[in-house]
Structures are given as structure tokens and as C-alpha cells.
Amino acid sequence: MTYEFEPACRRMEWLDPFYKQVWEKAYADAIPISGTFELTPRCNFNCSFCYVHLKEKDISKYGQELTSKQWIEIAKQAKDEGTTWLCITGGEPLLHPDFEEIYTTLAKMGFFITLQTNGYLIKDKYIKIFEDYPPRGIKITLYGASDETYQKVCGIKDGFTKVHQGIQLLKQMKIPVQLVSTITKQNIEEHKKMAFYAFINQIPYASTGGIRNSIRKENAELDEIRVKENIEKSKIEEIKHFINNPINIERKPCTYCKDYRLGYWITWDGKIRFCSFLNEPDISIKELSFKEAWQRLVEFEDQLDWPQE
């Protein structure tokens, strides 16, 4: 079948016109302009709905973390192939043993870096790092508006207090901060308080009640913490969307994703993938050059098709 093609960036109204042209060019030529480095599965929080979280003693059972040398070499090759936007995430990325070396080296290479963190550790040496090499932005996941809710959701004491302190330090340094929340039964009572916290601190805020099943982790606890009402509302909105914007089967399925032909995700153990939630394809960045791995990923995406039923 011959498919219609349309880059998802054409539907991203918020994207600057100049950058939209850049992304269109990247889409046309399959240039990996945007990447995510999942530095580590380590995390100081213990959220039941997280799909990338291992205790240090368990990491070796599932794989081996990439070293600073490996991440830096991947970044050099990715830059040569066109990567400009880079998201650094985890787990909690600040817990990678070589975070400082990795981050500062990548910053010196000129990437537009967004850091995704829970915000708990933003103090001391990390403040100095971000003062010297400010990221383009920091996205912090807000789990509640009190220490009590952080204890329920994340299993950690003084969570909100520490995160609030980190946010204020970042604001003082004028580093752009964005707050995001996943709303569950454990924190729904503080949803409005979280939104108000973002408002009074003049920080962009987004929340979701949708907890996606991930095939990278067992999902046994997810049904227990999902907010059923949010699921129903979400389903209704999804149905309305597809009534008004029916899926075009003449259009290649991957083109509905903004990262198709221009974005990638590299896992903590060195697999390059299309999406953070998937456990395939199994393309090892340790065994191939970045260019070869990217080409294989694009080929994998191009082979994806609609299901028969």
C-alpha cells in the first residue's frame, strides 16, 4: 500500500515557525534531530506507577548502565547525525554515578538540553553545575502539594519541602521550569492545590489522569491507583476526537507520532527505541554506530502497519 505522509510537527501549533521548518526538513530527510537519553533506572522515589525504576542492587539483574564514556561517545555521534534537542531523563538522572561529567560534556557540545527530574536533589553541587551550564529548561514532576502526599505517592519524607526548595533555587537562577503531574487516587485531593502552587509561582503546569500500561514493567498496581472518573472522561474525549478526526488508513500509522523519522529514545542499558513505553525493537547502541542504529530504527518504523482487525 502507498501511504500518505504528513509530519506530526505540522499539527504542533505551539512550535515556533522557524523550528517548525527545521523539523519539517528533519522529517523529510530522516534526520534524528531530537533525542532522549534515559541515563539510569535509579531513583530516590518509589512511585508505584513508574516504568523505569530499579534499586541499585537490582540493576545488574536487568542489564548494565552505560558509562559516562559511552554516553558521551553516543552524543558525539548523534550530534554528527543532526541531533540538536536532547532530553536527559531516568529514573532520576541526577543519580547516575557520572551525571556531572555526562551533563557538562553534553552542555559544552551545544545541545538544547531539557532535564527531567523529580526535583528533590536540586541543591548543592547541582546548583553549581546548572549555574555554569544552564539547561534550556527543567521539567519537574510534581506529585503533591504537601509532604504527606509525597509520602503516600513516592514513599519519601519531606518530598514537597525539598522539591519546593529546588524549584525556588532554579527560579532564582532564571532557569525555565515546567511542572507536570500524574493524578492518581493517592494525590487527586491535592490536584487543585498543585495547580494553584504552579499559578502563584508563575510556572507552566500540565497534569494527566491517564496512567498508561507499559510493557517495560509489570502493571499489577496500576488499576488500584487509577482515577476511574478521569479514565471515563479521557475515553469520552478520545472518542470525540476520533469522530471529528477519523484515522486515515491511507496514512502511515507512525506519522501520528511527533518523533517519527526525527526522534529517538535510548534506554539506560543501551537500546535505541521509538518510544519510552516500548521494549522493541532490540537495537543495541553498544554494538552499532549511532548512524547504523538510527537507520535500523527508521527501517523498523517504516515496516509498522495497521493491524488487520
PLM regions: where:
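Flexible mid-to-C-terminal extensions adjoining Fe-S/redox cofactors in radical SAM and related proteins
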Residues: M1-K25, D29-I31, C254, D269-E309
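Radical SAM enzyme [4Fe-4S]-AdoMet core and its adjacent flexible, acidic
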Residues: M1, R136, T141-R261, W265-D269, ...
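Short, intrinsically disordered, charge-biased short linear motifs at domain edges
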Residues: I33-S34, E238-P246, E299-D305
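Alpha-helix N-cap/helix-start and coil->helix boundary motif
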Residues: N44, E100, S146-D147, K291
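Conserved alpha-helical substructure of the radical SAM core
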Residues: T2-G137
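Residues that scaffold the ATP/ADP-binding catalytic core of kinase and kinase-like folds
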Residues: N46, C50, K125, E148-T149, ...
